[in-house]
Amino acid sequence: MLFNLFKNTLWAFFVLAILQTSALSFTLEVAGNIENTTYPVKKSYLFTDKQLLAMPVRSITTSTSWTPQRKFEGIGVADILARVGAKGSTLTFYALNDYYIDVPLSDVEKYNMILAYKMDGVMLKIRNFGPLFLVYPRDAAGPELNSPLYNSRFIWQVDRIVIK
């Protein structure tokens, strides 16, 4: 009986370790009109979570339509575009559920948005906007970003960007 208790406890710790590891693991695929690829046949660049977390950290403190003011930390969209050698005028951000939104490249230049992976120092999970959440500096930019058009561009659960 004691052996079964030990075996079940060990199994529970093993499952918990797997769940914790997988909860933080994510990727971002960037495809379309890009110069640098990790998968030339697909013409795409696949970032692992380790690669993304190693990039310079940017932060935006802002409210969203779903949250009061929070500190978001993540990767600058401009940094991702530079890494892949993006050329185009439109970025299509896709979520895990295949929801997508088109964002003009001019937004990146004007607002310096981030793909956030943390909110108030806590890693985002799928149930709370993760793994990646496109965040604009809504509070700092004035009333223009507090509109239905820009609210629709705050896409969460991002896993893919296509450059057109």
Q: Language-model segments: what does each one mean?
A:
Residues 1-11:
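Bacterial N-terminal signal peptides that target proteins for export
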Residues 23-164:
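N-terminal intrinsically disordered, low-complexity segments enriched in P/E/S/T
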Residues 9-20:
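Bacterial N-terminal signal peptides
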Residues 2-3, 21-24:
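Intrinsically disordered, low-complexity segments enriched in Ser/Pro/Gly/Ala and basic residues
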